[in-house]
């Protein structure tokens, strides 16, 4: 049965840095930032917060189409949500990854998550390569030593890469933006994510994001999971 869509957007300011809020069935999402495909600024930043990971594909799709997909930083933050949903439900997670990704990015993400989320006699649950907690590694406050327990609401902090925007030269048209997603799960805290915006669409897509699924530091203790 379809959930009731109880969404409301509340604009809390008029500038590009103004925070906006979106609600869906008791889950709250906010975004703030001035990252944009229209122009490059090395000082540009973005922040996304969320009280919960979307419960299912319906919520994820609504969030993307109506709110976070309209900004590069919102779209980049949604990849960690999609990775978590994939860990909970492979079919729904795959649909989420497909929804927000440039086609060539889908197999790259899914093939790695299958390995890192799966267990076998060669990769038991206590093996350092098995990293079900990987989606939490870019959430603010999550570190190996605290069991990758992030602060709440969950927060993804981003800033512009030193690499300027580029126009896609093959497989279509669009502006590719290079964004650093900050995370304490690796020695290199700046995790590069490429986001693309096509000229005929108001939505963004994740073009490439290997830094988000690269093996992070082994956890110390028990991962509590995400809400």
Question: What does each model-found stretch correspond to?
Answer:
Residues 11, 81-88, 182-186:
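Short, flexible beta-strand-to-coil junctions
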Residues 19-25:
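Cleaved targeting-peptide boundary
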Residues 30-138:
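Core segments of small alpha/beta cavity-forming domains
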Residues 14-18:
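Sec/Tat signal peptide C-region and signal peptidase I cleavage site
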Residues 108-184:
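Surface-exposed, charged secondary-structure patches
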Residues 22, 178-180, 185-226:
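Short beta-strand edge/turn micro-motifs at domain boundaries
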Residues 4-13:
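Sec-dependent N-terminal signal peptides
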């Amino acid at each position: 049965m379809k959930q009731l869509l109880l969404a409301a957007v509340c604009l809390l300011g008029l500038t590009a840095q103004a925070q906006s809020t979106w609600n869906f069935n008791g889950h709250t999402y906010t975004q703030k930032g001035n990252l944009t495909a229209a122009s490059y600024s090395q000082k540009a930043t973005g922040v996304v917060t969320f009280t919960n990971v979307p419960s299912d594909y319906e919520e994820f799709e609504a969030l993307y189409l109506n709110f976070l997909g309209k900004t590069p930083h919102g779209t980049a933050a949604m990849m960690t949500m999609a990775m978590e949903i994939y860990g909970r439900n492979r079919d729904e997670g795959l649909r989420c990854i497909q929804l927000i990704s440039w086609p060539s990015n889908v197999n790259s993400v899914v093939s790695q998550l299958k390995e890192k989320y799966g267990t076998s006699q060669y990769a038991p649950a206590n093996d350092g390569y098995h990293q079900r907690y990987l989606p939490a590694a870019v959430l603010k406050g999550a570190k190996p030593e605290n069991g990758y327990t992030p602060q709440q609401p969950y927060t993804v902090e981003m800033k512009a890469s030193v690499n300027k925007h580029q126009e896609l030269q093959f497989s279509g048209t669009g502006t590719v933006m290079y964004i650093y997603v900050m995370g304490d799960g690796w020695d290199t805290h700046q995790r590069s994510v490429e986001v693309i915006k096509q000229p005929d669409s108001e939505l963004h897509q994740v073009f490439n994001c290997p830094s988000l699924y690269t093996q992070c530091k082994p956890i110390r203790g028990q991962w509590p999971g995400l809400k």
